[in-house]
Amino acid sequence: MSREAATVLEDLTCVEKLAQLFPEASPVRIAVRLSTMSPGRQRLQEQTIIEFGTSHEVLFGSSLPLEFEDRVRLVNSDRSLDVWATVVAVRYHSGRKAVAARFEGKVENWIIKP
């Protein structure tokens, strides 16, 4: 691998690296409120940005303690996106975490169509 290629790979964000595992992923930028229930049944939430999407998945950074098969809710500011999804991948890199979650059902108004 050339030095330039290695530098480009090092410069990719954690979410960009996870997106490489989803060849159909397109870059998007959608601000959402992410929420989930902790194992103790406490509601956890944060604001995040969906950075990549496919017709069935979204990829975003998160500081919440999410794991494979956790259920999350994603809601944008005008509630035109209000969906449940299941975590299908988590990637840790340089102290950051990227998450991929698959929609639990058909999302009528999702911007990326199959």
Regions found by a protein language model. Give the residues of each.
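Structured alpha-helical
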Residues: 1-114
